[in-house]
Amino acid sequence: MKKIALTMVATSILGVSSMSQAAINVCVFDLLGKSGESFQMAQEWALAAKGWGADVNLIPRQDEGVADNDFKAGKCDAVFETSMRARQYNKFAGSIDSLGGVPSNAVAQKVIAYALDARNATKMTTNLGGKKYEIAGIAPLGSAYIFVRDKNINSIEKAAGKKFAVLGYDPAQKIMVQRVGAQAVISDISNFVAKFNNGQVDMVGAPAYAYKPLEIYKGLGTNGAMFNFPVLQVTADLVIRPEKFPAGFGQKSRDYFVKNVAKSFAMINRLEAGIPAKYKMNLNPADKLKYQKLLREGRMELTKQGIYDPAMMSVLKKARCAVDKANFECALGGE
């Protein structure tokens, strides 16, 4: 009996041990799969995660929709995807990508560090339909710029009637494009630039991160241009099911992302510098102010519609005004 009891205890201990060491599957969206910048960043994070008691198995996904569906289906215990898609799990973090909300890398750095701070831990966790989700990291992917096939489309007025590829899962893009009188062409992250390159659409918004992998230069050709004016800041969220990870893992992971945010911006600066100067079209001060006001109006409208989180809108405005006190909106209410 004693031997049987000891055998049972040993089996139980081994079972618990194997459970605690079981690999945690994390789906990582990267346009270039394993060779992409995001996947390489995830590999460094996974190495650090071992020190927090998690054995992470990274699963590359070049189609973001597939990565998200795998997470929903339980094939992955976490997913690293754009905040625009991750907004469904956490509106506070997902609203950093609001239209015109983060006009520079300096503002982005302040906002990301604040959001990931321990004081906002409760805002990083949500309970949806009985399922718990937690944002365990936010990484910047850079400002999104508008690319046009014809550099003569150099104002809002001239964008009227033009076809603009928008991501179907982000209603904010569709609403904003319609506000300027352009035609929203519903697309996905896997084909929105392809439509620009083959002439199905006249305009597209994307960060420098996508310039080479998606070959945006093919759509620009010899007559295209990039508005050197950031429309929004693209970020990626690491969404986890906290029960699948060791206790306290979420905050340790968020602290890691804060420490590495400067490294991420170094990558972004390198990618932005890689876009040839011949394509970059600067706006005059009057047009720049006009666009800022248009984005502000759209942002406030989308917040009223419940698409953006009001608390994050307040955080973004404070960060913008801390970096640029002369900003016209700093003396205005409404956000």
What is each PLM-predicted segment?
Residues 1-8:
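Bacterial N-terminal signal peptides that target proteins for export
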Residues 16-22:
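Sec/Tat signal peptide C-region and signal peptidase I cleavage site
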Residues 23-52, 132-198, 202:
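Bilobed "Venus flytrap"/periplasmic-binding protein-like clamshell domains
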Residues 59-98, 147-149, 204-220:
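Pocket-flanking alpha-helical
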Residues 82-179, 230-335:
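Contiguous mixed-secondary-structure segments that line small-molecule binding/active-site clefts
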